[in-house]
Amino acid sequence: MIGDGGELALVDVREELIFSQRHLLLARSIPLSRLELKFAQLVPRRLTRIVLCDDGDGIAGRAAAILARNGYSDLSILDGGIDAWAAAEYELFSGVNVPSKAFGEYIEHESGTPSIAAAELEQLLREKADIVVLDSRPFDEYSRVSIPTGVNVPGAELVLRAREIAPSPDTTIVVNCAGRTRSIIGAQSLINAGVPNKVVALRNGTMGWNLAGFACDSGKNRRAPDVSPNTLDWARTAARQVAQSCGVERIDHPTLEAWRKDEARTLYLFDVRDPAEYASGHVAGAVSAPGGQLVQATDHYVGTLGARIVLVDDAEVRAAMTGSWLRQMGWKDVFVLAEVGSEKGQPKTAMLDSETQSSGTVDCVELNALLSRNAATVVDLALSRDYLAGHIPGAWFAIRTRLKRALGKIPLSETLVLTSEDGALARLAAAEAEALVDSPVRVLAGGNAAWRAAGYALSTEARMADEAVDQWRKPYERSGDTKAAMNEYLAWEIDLLPRIARDGSLKFFSH
């Protein structure tokens, strides 16, 4: 099935951290615990061929039952799960976003993308050389930690904005990210577009900078200036040439509308501009997916292999460059739509129906009163990163699909109250909890978002009724020896290319 040319969604329903330890190369991580929330966005077409995989523990069967109830009809389960795949001597991969990470390594190898070591860059900055550092990550990552003097120019914005920041061809441009992939892709984007400057990637990004013993900035707000008409004209022409050379085609709105009605093919419509531009107005139905992130984490946005992908950008530059990379990654049907719409807000993706949902709720005032007299036990089903950042005082962390085990560790009071980010996941889990406890079960209306909005206190004192296996952690987010974790991660990235070649599922090419 893999590589036969037809559409296929290969979905791993284990928790993300477990998924990250070993998984099939082209599998998408959609944990059973959040299946109803995430599946329809990643796999929207009900007739898609779907293969579900697990550890052979039966959770893929539970996922299949939910999907079948919601109209997905072409469902299979990988017999024997991950262990059977390994026993058949097929490759398994660790980490997340593996195809995108491997692609970055491939591009550096095939294109000879030049790079600069942290020590050399530090010396140039100290000597005030004619150099600019462009950080190709989203602003939230940049603001947490950045290279001194670095300006935030997220990946797909580089070709559009770099010449505005470095108008002199004598200025050296250094592109960085946290590790390797976005630095390489960002630098090579500028080279492919033909900027007259010397362009290099910062080898190993901010992690390499830290490992070399240099301090990063934090909390900075250096952003690219607005683009002049001349810069836009140059960038549009350059990006079009790159896109055309990679086989990216442009379409018009009638073509898009015809494809929306095509029930035989999956369509993804992504607005690859800056999120602020998206928020000000976009084509109806488009999902915000800044181009750099779409290339960096394609599997987080696109659940169906072989689907059509339409990239929207009124300036065309971001879509053209993003499309060129997706084509080189092996996505055959990638198109650019140069439009801007008036739609506001994210498109509403239908949440899949659960078999049963409890209707019993409490509001924030009621919950606060229950807690004040020790009459409620709160179980928080939010993602562990969010829980650890701040939660309802006294709340226990648990994962929905492991609720039976978690509840066995929690001393229950008069009422069990479930909460989650916005309450949606808690509603899905309520009936499951009711079958496990004798206490009445209620859901916090509006979830943790409502609690925060009402001004109630949050706590960071963790009560873990389950392990935090729901999320993979970046090296610098992990406890323990951070430097060792960074070195391990960078070595993992570099080692991907030969392993991808052995697997044989991906066919990359370079511009």
Regions found by a protein language model. Name each.
Residues 1-9, 13-132, 136-268, 272-377, ...:
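Rhodanese-like catalytic fold shared by cysteine-dependent sulfurtransferases
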